[in-house]
């Protein structure tokens, strides 16, 4: 299935690229989420007319993400949780908790943007957490977990 990408897609291509993908990936993900359109002659012509508008929109999204990344780089978030004597938490700190703490401190972050590669935080201490704001922009935030 041949498609034209309407935005940058990780491991696939950039805005305006013609790509060949498996039919299921195109029908179930790229087309419904508005990330691509079928590469027909009419759609190619329509895309070329809208290219400047789409490129400006993509540049605005990236600039917004870079601004948020600069704000996050200066930020250190403290989360209080109940813990046992040895520093092991009763429960865990997940992406939702970190996103809520970052939003409360003034920077809007969705839980899907927070990356915890080793799973949830289950101990008291300081952790560096990656926040994936855009396909090209990633920030690191220091999260301090203290016992209540």
From Swiss-Prot:
Pfam families reported in the protein's UniProt record: Ribosomal_L9_C, Ribosomal_L9_N
GO biological process assignments: translation
Keywords: Ribonucleoprotein, Ribosomal protein, RNA-binding, rRNA-binding
Signal sequence coordinates: none
GO terms under cellular component: ribonucleoprotein complex; ribosome
Cystine residue pairs: none
Gene Ontology MF annotations: rRNA binding; structural constituent of ribosome
Entries under InterPro entries matching the protein: Ribosomal_bL9, Ribosomal_bL9/RNase_H1_N, Ribosomal_bL9_bac/chp, Ribosomal_bL9_C, Ribosomal_bL9_C_sf, Ribosomal_bL9_N, Ribosomal_bL9_N_sf
NCBIfam families reported for this sequence: L9
Functional note: Binds to the 23S rRNA.
Family: Belongs to the bacterial ribosomal protein bL9 family.
The name this protein goes by in its record: Large ribosomal subunit protein bL9
């Amino acid at each position: 299935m041949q498609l034209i990408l309407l935005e940058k897609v990780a491991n696939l291509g950039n805005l305006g690229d013609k790509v060949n993908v498996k039919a299921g990936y195109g029908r179930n993900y790229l087309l419904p989420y508005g990330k691509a359109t079928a590469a027909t002659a009419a759609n190619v012509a329509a895309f070329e007319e809208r290219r400047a508008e789409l490129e400006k929109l993509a540049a605005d999204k990236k600039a917004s993400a870079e601004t948020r990344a600069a704000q996050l780089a200066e930020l250190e978030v403290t989360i209080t949780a109940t813990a046992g004597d040895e520093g092991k938490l009763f429960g865990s700190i997940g992406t939702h908790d970190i996103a809520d703490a970052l939003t409360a401190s003034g920077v809007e972050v969705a839980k899907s943007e927070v990356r915890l590669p080793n799973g949830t935080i289950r101990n008291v201490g300081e952790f560096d957490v990656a926040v994936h704001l855009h396909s090209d922009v990633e920030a690191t935030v220091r999260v301090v977990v203290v016992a209540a």
